[in-house]
Amino acid sequence: MPTKTVVENDVEIIMPKLYKVMLLNDDYTTFDFVIEILKTVFHKNEEEAINITLKVDREGSAAVGVYPYEIAQVKIEKTHTLARQAGYPLRAVMEEV
């Protein structure tokens, strides 16, 4: 999924495509759980996690981070697994940047 090739000192570097991970709002997942996901899965600090959670609640979705495809996919899967285990319908999606 490379998007850009750069040649430096006769070494070809292929830059991966990047994907924005978004959290989607629902009527059941608690603020505390979303904040915990943001801190543990996405490594956000408390203030960042609260701000993102409020944006998800107000606007219906919010960007959490930008990652190469494989990393974005793993973070989404981890979010869905933890949400299911806790009994919440929290969803995350990705879109190409």
Curated annotation (Swiss-Prot):
Gene Ontology BP annotations: protein catabolic process; proteolysis
Matches recorded under Gene3D superfamilies: 3.30.1390.10
A Pfam family annotated for this UniProt entry: ClpS
Assembly, per entry: Binds to the N-terminal domain of the chaperone ClpA.
PANTHER family (alphabetical): ATP-DEPENDENT CLP PROTEASE ADAPTER PROTEIN CLPS (PTHR33473:SF19), ATP-DEPENDENT CLP PROTEASE ADAPTER PROTEIN CLPS1, CHLOROPLASTIC (PTHR33473)
Role: Involved in the modulation of the specificity of the ClpAP-mediated ATP-dependent protein degradation.
Family stated for the protein in its record: Belongs to the ClpS family.
Protein name: ATP-dependent Clp protease adapter protein ClpS
Organism in which the protein naturally occurs: Nautilia profundicola (strain ATCC BAA-1463 / DSM 18972 / AmH)
Species lineage: Bacteria, Pseudomonadati, Campylobacterota, Epsilonproteobacteria, Nautiliales
